[in-house]
Amino acid sequence: MEKKYRFYLVNAFGLPEGSRYAHRSLKGPKEEVLMNYDNVKHLLADVEWDLHNGAIASYGDWPVENREEFGLAAAARIPLVREGCESGKYNAIVLLGGGEPGFNESREIGRKFNIPVTACGHSQMHFATMLGNKFSVIDMAESHNMYYYNLIIQHRMDHRCASIRNINYPLPRPGGDESRSIPKEKKKALAGEHSDMVETAVTEAVAAIEEDGAEVITFGCSALFWLQPFLQKRLTELGWEIPVLEGYSCAIELAKAMVNLGVDASGLTFPVDHPKKIRRKKTF
């Protein structure tokens, strides 16, 4: 029996095999390639899903982090979204990656096929604003912070965002500090060992609550999404009754909600090439 949900999950970028800067699996079964699959497999149990591991990055063999790289990643991902929509196999597209390159362009494509497109940052922000007055973002590097800052403004969430807190664990790239390794810190945490990265995230989350007024915690880069259960547990143990969200879960669940509602996006926000009606004026 065909499942109700048929999703195409598309990573933000891919890296060539053998890249020394890879921070996630580059090949293998989809369950092994999808980061933090164990944290979202219960949400995918009722979904027929395929995964594209992302178009190979054109800027180099390291993960995307700054504006130039995000622009190139967006241009490479958009054709994958169109292919997914044209295939007729899917009723939603889920864009993986916290910085959501190509999201608005993908929504425009999806609208033409009546297919909703969701992304991690957008989904987290909207769920967060349903749960509390203001949210803070735990993020990993200065350049990514400022890219994400603009993303928050683009989604008109600047009045609901308390702060972006930088834990300073940049993604691997040429000339970077290899001692501050996200994969190594993740491995320690999963093994039940002390992780400086987890401790830093806890410190910054508490500061976001006490100093910035955050009532919900979210994440910027998807390389940090694995922190969600660790941070949620630690904050609860400290007595903070605050939800901690991560992007994959939010994007998957928002896609389900949109399929259930039979909506994709407003045709006034994303008009087709030859709309039946036009507006003479757009106000702010």
Question: What are these language model-derived features?
Answer:
Residues 48-74, 175-176:
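N-terminal beta-loop-helix "entrance" segment that forms/cooperates
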Residues 65-83, 195-204:
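Glycine-rich, highly charged phosphate/nucleotide-binding loops
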Residues 78-127:
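Glycine/small-residue-rich loop that forms an oxyanion/phosphate-binding "nest" at active or ligand-binding sites
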Residues 87-97, 214-222, 245:
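Periplasmic-binding protein-like
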Residues 107-131, 233-252:
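Short, acidic/small-residue loops that bind anionic groups at enzyme active sites
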Residues 126-168, 256-284:
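Short, glycine-/small-residue-rich phosphate/pyrophosphate-handling segment
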Residues 151-220:
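Active-site rim beta-loop-alpha module in soluble metabolic enzymes
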